[in-house]
Amino acid sequence: MATCAIQQSAFVGQAVGKSQNEFIRKVGNFGEGRITMRRTVKSAPQSIWYGEDRPKYLGPFSEQTPSYLTGEFPGDYGWDTAGLSADPETFARNRELEVIHCRWAMLGALGCVFPEILSKNGVKFGEAVWFKAGSQIFSEGGLDYLGNPNLVHAQSILAIWACQVVLMGFVEGYRVGGGPLGEGLDKIYPGGAFDPLGLADDPEAFAELKVKEIKNGRLAMFSMFGFFVQAIVTGKGPIENLSDHINDPVANNAWAYATNFVPGK
């Protein structure tokens, strides 16, 4: 089933997203008009998280959802008060950005808490607190991965920066621009060689995994924001803050810090 919207434009079109599970847009010369098409995921109506009867952001109290939020994509709860998804091209771009940021946030949240947990259980780190760890590279001995100089021994911030730019830039460029392993695959959910475990083989299971990914990713983005605020306000890592709160919840909570916090002190 396809929903067509004709918008005024005069450029030769393009096709974005070839996977049957993704947002399909075809733009072509049609007089002075442009045809934009969306293709609904075939397996979506069989899942409670997709379609018209999917859960809404306020449950039974949700207002009329916008007509352009049809429930064909994971994480669509019918909420768009700012109209960010009204334009199909903007919607497609924002979906891609959200999924990518969700994945980075999930990795980041794990990286913020895991070293502290290991440190509290006897694993030696030069610095286990996430926002202090990078400063170890400026110390006399440099930065050792997991405290072991035989793994990764970094002493140059410029070398680290160059490696990140080159390696991460290459991967991101490959994802966006395509290549032998990614040709003809979707930019958000490539599958193929990028799915060695075959998680996308079953369309129904894959549709559910997309929902789980976006929900956990959104939670991780909020978590990272909380870690940033904690670091600024308390100067401690998330695990130490949690431990302090458990030991004395009255003195260590958001309200107590908010009423006593003075920026710059």
Swiss-Prot record:
InterPro entries, sorted: Chloro_AB-bd_pln, Chloroa_b-bind
Record-listed chlorophyll a 1 binding positions: W79, S85, E98, R218
Sequence positions that bind chlorophyll b 1: Y57
Residues reported to bind chlorophyll a 6: H245, A254
Keywords: Acetylation, Chlorophyll, Chloroplast, Chromophore, Magnesium, Membrane, Metal-binding, Phosphoprotein, Photosynthesis, Photosystem I, Photosystem II, Plastid, Thylakoid, Transit peptide, Transmembrane, Transmembrane helix
UniProt-annotated binding residues for chlorophyll a 2: H101
Binding site residues for chlorophyll b 4: Q164, R175
SUPFAM superfamilies from the UniProt entry: Chlorophyll a-b binding protein (SSF103511)
Phosphothreonine sites (modified residues): T40
GO molecular function, one term: metal ion binding
Residues binding chlorophyll b 2, per UniProt: R103, V152, L181
Comment field on protein domains: The N-terminus of the protein extends into the stroma where it is involved with adhesion of granal membranes and post-translational modifications; both are believed to mediate the distribution of excitation energy between photosystems I and II.
Assembly and binders: The LHC complex consists of chlorophyll a-b binding proteins.
Name of this protein: Chlorophyll a-b binding protein 4, chloroplastic
Naturally occurring in which organism (per UniProt): Solanum lycopersicum
